Amino acid sequence: VHWTAEEKQLITGLWGKVNVADCGAEALARLLIVYPWTQRFFASFGNLSSPTAIIGNPMVRAHGKKVLTSFGEAVKNLDNIKNTFAQLSELHCDKLHVDPENFRLLGDILIIVLAAHFTKDFSPDCQAAWQKLVRAVAHALARKYH
């Protein structure tokens, strides 16, 4: 993926404002609520019976933070996203058998969460840069499937 200087600035500038714990928890909770079939990968998380239960679930919150922390590695390694996610791709493909479409869905949800949290900063140019990033991450995570 080729990044312009402006795209890199838009991504890193916004990322510096992100509360990884809060945005990660919200993104994963939204994924589980909006796309309930994704819950099957999180059966060990306990009560996922309602939106309130999901939002209040400490395991969802902790894993959301873990997911977004990992996403931060993409921000730090924009020029090497494929290698950054090689091990996670293998884990999600070989051991967890996650449908790679779910990576795209989570990326789209992350865009919504960022837009909701950073309305003033989330210009169309910023959205385009982030959309490019979430697609690159989803592609890197799905790489082991091909």
UniProtKB/Swiss-Prot annotation:
Record has Heme as a keyword: yes
Domain of life: Eukaryota
InterPro entries found in the cross-reference section: Globin, Globin-like_sf, Globin/Proto, Hemoglobin_b, Hemoglobin_oxygen_transport
A GO term from the CC aspect: hemoglobin complex
Domain Globin: 2-146
Tissues showing expression: Red blood cells.
GO molecular-function term, one example from the UniProt record: metal ion binding
CDD domains in the record: Hb-beta-like (cd08925)
Protein name (record): Hemoglobin subunit beta
Natural source organism: Aquila chrysaetos (Golden eagle)
Name of the gene encoding the protein in the UniProt record: HBB
